[in-house]
C-alpha cells in the first residue's frame, strides 16, 4: 500500500486524506456535513471489514443523491490508489522492446512525449537487450535517442493509444496539481506517485448523473483545486468494448473508475480477466438497481470483489427488497429515527448542502395528513365488488368478452375512486374532443352490460353485482365529486406556493388543469401547481405541499416513502382508508427493520398498531388486485394471438417487453426497437432501447394508419417531399441510405446471414458483432449510419460495389447530416408536444414551426402505465406500436 504508514489501513489512510482536503461540487464544500461524515465513515469501515463486503445505502432522496454518490466514488478512487501494488520496477519489467511508452521528463515530471522502448544497455555503446541493465534506451525517430538512468525510470509509462507519432503533440503539460495532491493529501513521496494503477472499481449509474458529478467534482487543498479526472483515469462504457474517457488520459491506461449505465455491461467488465483487478462494484440509483435486478445477485455474491455497494433513496421501491434479500449486508439507512440520532445542523450553507438539509428536514418533520370522505362505495361495498371480480376472473369459462368485462369494470372502479372531477365534466370534454383516446364512462357501462349478457348462468349474478355497484358510483359522482370539493377547500386554505397534485393517469392532468383554472377563487393565485402522475413524479423536486388524490402509488411515488415535501395530504374515501392504514403499518415495520439492521446504532419506539377492520379482509383485497394485474398482462398477449398468421406460425416476431399505456392500449416491443421518449427536462425526445423503457415514460408513436412506425422518418420524408429542407439535405438523405440498400440487396441475393457478414468484416480487421449487423438492418433501431467509416468501406468490399467504396466518405458524411437533422426533429417534437401539454406553444426554431401542425396529424403520445419484460412471440403486425385489445 503506497503513501501510508505500514500500520495504516485503507480506512485510516482515506480518512486522513479526507481530513486534509475538502470535497466540493461546483465549488460548494460538501464533505464537512455531519451526516456525510458519518456516511463516509460507514463506507470506509465496511469497505475492508471482511474479504468480501456488501453494503446497502438508503440515502435521503433523489434531490441530494449526488452528495452521497460523490463521496462513494471518491472513496472508491482513493482506495484504488492505495490498493495499487504496481511499482516502477513492475512497470519496467512489463515492457518489451518495440513497445510505445510515454516519458515524463524534467524535475517536476509534468511534460510527456511518446517514445519507442528499445531495451536496456549497460553503456552507451552496447546494443539494446531485453535483460535489465543500468540504462534504458528510448528512441524518438528523427528526434534521436534518449538514455535514462534508474532514477528517471519512474517517469516511464506504457502507452496504449493509437497515435503513431513519436513526439509530444496533443499531450497537455500537467499543471503539477496531481503531484501536489498525492504528496500533500495522500502523503506520498515523489517516487511513490503512480502513473499506472492496477485495480479498478465498476460503477453503474446513468450517463447524465455521471456527467453531473465528474464535471463538477473537485478537491480543495493547500489553496489549490483539482478534479477527480485529473487524479485517476475514468471512462464511461456504453458496451464492454465501447469506452468514452472523461478528462485527460495521455497514456490511455486502463480506467480506475469504469462507469456504465447497464448492469449487463458491468458484468462483462467484471468478468474480463485481462488488465486491472476489479476490487469493487457500485450500483447507484433506484432505476439502475431495478433494471439490473435479475443480474445483480450473481455480481453481489462474487467473492473476488472486495466490496459491493448498492445506493438508492430510502423511499425507493427497491430499498426494502434489497435489504431483505441480503441479510448479512451492512446497512446505512436514513430513516427518521436514524437522522434524529445522528443529524446535526449544517456545517456550511451552500447550494448543495441546502438541498441536502431540506431533504433531511422533509424526513424528520414529515407530516402525512389524511382527509377521509364519505361515499356510497363504502368498505363493505368495495369488498363485494372485488370479490365478485375475482370470482368471474377465476372461473374456467374463457372468452374475449369476459376479458373485456373485467378490464373495463376494473378501470371504471379505479376512475370512480380517484377522480377529483365530476363525470359529467369528463364526458363533456370527451364529447368536445378535448380528451383523446378516452372512453366515456357511460359507454363503458353499456359495454360491460352487453358483455354480461353473453355470460353463463354461473357468472351472471356476480356480473350484476359489479354492474349495480358501478352504476351507483356513476350516478353518485355524475354531477358533483367529493374529492374535487375537498381539493379546492384545501387549496383555498393553504399558504403553500409550490404544490404537486398526484393523479393516477395522464389524462387526469388536462381535466384537473381545467377544473382548477375555472375556479374563481383559485385561478389568480400566485403559485405553481404541478399535476403529475405517480409514475412521472420527480423526487428531485422539493414541494411545499403534495396532495395525492387517493391511495395512489406508482413507480416513482409512494405517499409514505416520499421525501419531496414535509407536508403530504392524501384525500381518501372510506373504502381506501383501510388499505392506506395497512400500508402505514407496513411502512413503520420496514422502518423498524432498517433501524435494527443499521450499522450505526439507532433507538426507535416501534409498536405494532391494531386495525379497526379485519387485516385478512384487506390482505384479500390486495391479493385480488395483484392477481388482476397479472391477468391483464396475460390477456393482452392472448388476444393478439387469435390470428391465422399466428396459428400457422407465419409472420411472427420475438418480443422482449409488454407495455400497458394510460390509454388502456398495449405495445409489444422487439429487442432492437428504440422508442421515442419525451424528456420534459431537456425539452426534447430521447431514443430509448426497449429494455430501458420504464413505467411513467411518455412515448411518441406515429398514428396507426401511417406507412411507417418511425415518426421522425415520416416527418423527414414529408419535409423533403414538400421542399421544406435544403437541396443539400435532400442529396444527403439519398446518399445516407445507400450503404444500407447495398447491404440488404447483397444479403438478399446471396442468402448471407448477419453472422456471416460479421465474420467477413472481422476477417478484414473491422470489429463488429452479429447483433450490430441486425440492428443496422432493423428499421426499428433507427440506425442512420455505422459508427465508423471503415464499416461502410467493408460493406462495399463484401458486396463488390466499387462506386460505394470510392464514395464511402461522402456516404458517411451524409449520414452525419441526416443524423443531425433527425436530432433537430426530435427536439422539435419534444418542444411541440410539451407546448401542447403546458399550453406554451412558443416555437423555438424554424423546424419546430415547420412540423408543429404535422406532428398533431402524425403523432400519438402515450404514457407507460406498466411494463413487463418477457421472452415471447406475437404476430408481426402487432409489434412496436400501441394497439387496442378488443
Pin down the residues of each PLM region.
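Conserved RecA-like P-loop NTPase helicase motor core
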Residues: 289, 515-619
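Recognition helix of helix-turn-helix/homeodomain-like DNA-binding domains
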Residues: 763-787
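Signature of the SF2 helicase/ATPase Hel1-core->accessory helical subdomain module
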Residues: 252-369, 381, 575-589, 594-598
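Preference for solvent-exposed, low-hydrophobicity sequence contexts
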Residues: 52, 93, 606-728, 795, ...
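Inter-Walker segment of RecA-like/P-loop motor cores
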Residues: 141, 175, 205-274
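Short alpha-helical "recognition helix" segments of helix-turn-helix
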Residues: 752-764
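Helicase motor interdomain insertion/brace
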Residues: 2-113, 123, 129-132, 137, ...
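DNA major-groove recognition helix of helix-turn-helix/homeodomain DNA-binding modules
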Residues: 787-806
Amino acid at each position: 500500500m503506497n503513501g501510508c504508514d505500514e500500520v495504516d489501513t485503507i480506512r485510516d489512510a482515506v480518512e486522513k486524506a479526507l481530513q486534509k482536503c475538502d470535497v466540493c461540487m461546483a465549488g460548494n464544500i460538501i464533505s464537512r456535513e455531519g451526516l456525510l461524515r458519518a456516511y463516509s465513515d460507514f463506507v470506509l469501515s465496511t469497505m475492508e471489514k471482511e474479504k468480501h463486503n456488501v453494503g446497502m445505502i438508503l440515502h435521503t432522496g433523489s434531490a441530494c443523491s449526488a452528495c452521497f454518490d460523490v463521496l462513494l466514488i471518491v472513496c472508491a478512487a482513493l482506495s484504488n490508489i492505495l490498493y495499487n501494488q504496481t511499482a516502477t520496477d513492475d512497470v519496467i519489467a512489463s515492457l518489451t522492446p518495440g513497445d510505445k511508452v510515454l516519458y515524463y521528463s524534467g524535475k517536476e515530471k509534468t511534460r510527456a512525449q511518446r517514445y519507442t522502448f528499445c531495451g536496456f544497455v549497460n553503456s552507451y555503446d552496447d546494443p539494446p537487450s531485453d535483460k535489465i541493465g543500468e540504462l534504458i534506451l528510448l528512441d524518438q525517430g528523427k528526434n534521436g535517442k534518449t538514455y535514462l538512468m534508474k532514477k528517471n525510470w519512474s517517469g516511464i509509462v506504457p502507452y496504449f493509444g493509437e497515435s503513431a507519432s513519436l513526439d509530444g503533440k496533443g499531450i497537455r503539460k500537467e499543471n503539477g496539481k496531481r503531484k501536489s495532491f498525492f504528496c500533500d493529501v495522500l502523503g506520498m513521496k515523489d517516487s511513490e506517485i503512480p502513473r499506472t494503477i492496477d485495480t479498478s472499481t465498476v460503477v453503474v449509474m446513468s450517463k447524465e448523473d455521471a456527467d453531473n458529478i465528474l464535471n463538477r467534482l473537485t478537491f480543495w487543498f493547500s489553496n489549490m483545486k483539482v478534479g477527480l479526472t485529473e487524479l485517476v483515469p475514468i471512462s464511461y462504457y456504453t458496451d464492454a468494448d465501447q469506452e468514452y474517457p472523461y478528462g485527460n488520459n495521455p497514456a490511455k491506461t486502463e480506467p480506475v473508475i469504469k462507469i456504465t449505465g447497464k448492469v449487463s455491461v458491468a458484468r462483462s467488465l467484471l468478468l474480463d480477466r485481462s488488465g486491472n483487478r476489479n476490487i469493487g462494484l457500485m450500483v447507484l440509483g433506484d432505476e439502475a438497481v431495478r433494471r439490473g435486478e435479475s443480474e445483480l445477485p450473481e455480481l453481489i455474491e462474487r467473492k473476488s470483489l472486495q466490496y459491493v455497494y448498492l445506493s438508492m433513496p430510502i423511499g425507493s421501491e427497491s430499498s426494502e427488497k434489497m435489504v431483505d434479500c441480503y441479510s448479512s449486508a451492512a446497512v446505512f439507512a436514513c430513516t427518521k429515527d436514524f437522522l434524529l440520532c445522528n443529524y446535526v445542523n449544517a456545517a456550511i450553507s451552500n447550494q448543495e448542502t441546502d438541498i441536502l438539509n431540506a431533504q433531511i428536514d422533509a424526513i424528520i418533520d414529515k407530516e402525512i395528513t389524511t382527509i377521509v370522505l364519505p361515499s356510497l362505495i363504502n368498505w363493505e361495498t368495495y369488498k363485494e365488488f372485488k370479490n365478485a371480480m375475482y370470482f368471474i376472473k377465476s372461473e374456467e369459462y374463457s372468452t374475449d368478452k369476459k376479458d373485456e368485462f373485467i378490464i373495463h369494470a376494473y378501470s371504471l372502479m379505479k376512475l370512480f375512486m380517484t377522480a377529483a372531477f365530476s363525470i359529467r365534466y369528463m364526458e363533456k370534454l370527451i364529447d368536445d374532443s378535448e380528451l383523446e383516446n378516452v372512453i366515456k364512462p357511460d359507454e363503458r357501462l353499456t359495454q360491460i352490460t352487453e358483455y354480461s349478457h353473453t355470460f353463463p348462468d354461473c357468472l351472471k349474478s356476480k356480473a350484476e353485482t359489479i354492474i349495480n355497484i358501478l352504476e351507483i358510483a356513476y350516478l353518485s359522482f355524475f354531477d358533483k365529486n367529493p374529492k374535487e370539493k375537498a381539493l379546492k377547500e384545501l387549496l383555498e386554505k393553504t399558504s403553500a406556493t409550490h404544490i404537486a397534485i398526484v393523479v393516477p393517469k395522464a389524462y387526469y392532468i388536462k381535466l384537473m388543469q381545467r377544473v382548477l383554472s375555472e375556479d374563481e377563487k383559485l385561478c389568480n393565485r400566485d403559485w405553481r401547481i404541478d399535476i403529475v402522475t405517480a409514475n412521472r413524479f420527480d423526487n428531485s423536486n422539493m414541494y411545499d405541499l403534495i396532495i395525492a388524490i387517493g391511495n395512489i402509488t406508482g413507480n416513482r411515488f409512494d405517499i409514505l416513502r416520499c421525501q419531496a415535501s414535509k407536508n403530504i395530504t392524501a384525500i381518501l374515501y372510506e373504502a381506501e382508508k383501510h388499505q392506506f392504514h395497512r400500508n402505514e403499518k407496513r411502512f413503520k415495520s420496514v422502518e423498524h427493520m432498517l433501524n435494527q439492521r443499521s450499522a450505526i446504532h439507532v433507538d426507535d419506539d416501534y409498536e405494532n398498531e391494531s386495525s379497526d377492520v379485519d387485516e385478512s379482509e384487506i390482505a384479500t383485497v390486495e391479493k385480488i388486485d395483484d392477481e388482476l394485474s397479472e391477468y391483464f398482462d396475460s390477456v393482452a398477449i392472448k388476444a393478439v394471438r387469435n390470428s391465422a398468421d399466428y396459428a400457422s406460425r407465419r409472420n411472427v416476431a420475438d418480443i422482449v417487453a409488454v407495455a400497458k399505456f394510460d390509454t388502456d392500449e398495449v405495445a409489444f416491443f422487439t429487442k432492437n426497437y428504440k422508442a421515442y421518449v419525451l424528456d420534459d427536462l431537456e425539452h426534447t425526445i430521447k431514443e430509448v432501447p426497449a429494455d430501458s423503457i420504464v413505467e411513467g415514460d411518455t412515448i411518441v408513436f406515429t398514428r396507426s394508419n401511417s406507412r411507417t412506425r418511425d415518426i421522425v422518418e415520416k416527418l423527414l420524408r414529408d419535409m423533403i417531399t414538400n421542399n421544406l429542407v435544403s437541396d443539400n439535405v435532400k442529396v444527403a438523405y439519398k446518399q445516407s441510405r445507400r450503404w444500407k440498400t447495398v447491404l440488404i440487396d447483397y444479403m438478399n441475393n446471396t442468402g448471407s446471414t448477419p453472422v456471416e457478414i460479421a465474420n467477413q468484416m472481422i476477417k478484414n480487421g473491422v470489429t463488429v458483432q452479429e447483433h450490430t449487423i441486425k440492428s443496422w438492418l432493423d428499421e426499428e433501431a433507427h440506425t442512420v449510419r455505422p459508427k465508423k467509416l471503415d464499416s461502410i468501406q467493408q460493406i462495399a468490399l463484401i458486396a463488390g460495389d466499387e462506386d460505394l467504396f470510392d464514395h464511402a466518405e461522402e456516404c458517411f458524411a451524409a449520414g452525419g447530416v441526416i443524423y443531425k437533422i433527425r436530432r433537430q426533429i426530435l427536439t422539435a417534437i419534444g418542444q411541440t408536444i410539451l407546448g401542447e401539454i403546458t399550453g406554451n406553444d412558443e416555437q423555438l426554431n424554424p423546424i419546430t414551426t415547420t412540423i408543429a401542425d404535422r406532428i398533431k396529424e402524425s403523432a400519438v403520445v402515450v404514457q407507460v402505465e406498466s411494463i413487463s419484460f418477457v421472452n415471447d412471440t406475437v404476430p408481426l403486425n402487432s409489434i412496436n406500436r400501441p394497439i387496442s385489445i378488443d
